[in-house]
Amino acid sequence: MAKITGNLVATGLKFSIVTARFNDFINDKLLSGAVDTLVRHGAVESDIDTVWVPGAFEIPLVAKKMAESGKYDAVICLGTVIRGSTTHYDYVCNEVAKGIGAVALQTGVPIMFGVLTTESIEQAIERAGTKAGNKGAECALGAIEMVNVLKAL
């Protein structure tokens, strides 16, 4: 039985990171974690392009454009949606998740979902580099692994 796995070596790979500007005090930390992880695993900063969009809802469109460009081995999507007192949270979270998943399936490029969907600011802070780790860094690891898994197939 063959066991196909992806390694965590980013040498020679190119990445795009699409980050929402809304809640940027959290998203800056997610972005820093992602870039740091990519570099620690062999990517060079000149092979990492970052694009800022107004909010999480706009991420899938830009991720699709980046994936279709053929310039990137993977696209990492970062943002934070914090529940408020209206149903807006539910609509945004659902559409962003569907949109990012659709882009991956349509393009065949790994598109990583690093959009925090939290009940509170405290939960978001925990996931951006404190006691729950940095989800931007985790997405970067996932991107590296997925690129290498797809290359091994």
From Swiss-Prot:
PANTHER family: 6,7-DIMETHYL-8-RIBITYLLUMAZINE SYNTHASE, 6,7-DIMETHYL-8-RIBITYLLUMAZINE SYNTHASE DMRL SYNTHASE LUMAZINE SYNTHASE
Catalytic activity as recorded in UniProt: (2S)-2-hydroxy-3-oxobutyl phosphate + 5-amino-6-(D-ribitylamino)uracil = 6,7-dimethyl-8-(1-D-ribityl)lumazine + phosphate + 2 H2O + H(+)
InterPro entries (UniProt xref): LS, LS/RS, LS/RS_sf
Descriptive protein name: 6,7-dimethyl-8-ribityllumazine synthase
Binding site for 5-amino-6-(D-ribitylamino)uracil: 22, 56-58, 80-82, 113
Taxonomic lineage: Bacteria, Pseudomonadati, Pseudomonadota, Gammaproteobacteria, Pasteurellales
The keyword Oxidoreductase is assigned to this record: no
Subunit structure comment from the entry: Forms an icosahedral capsid composed of 60 subunits, arranged as a dodecamer of pentamers.
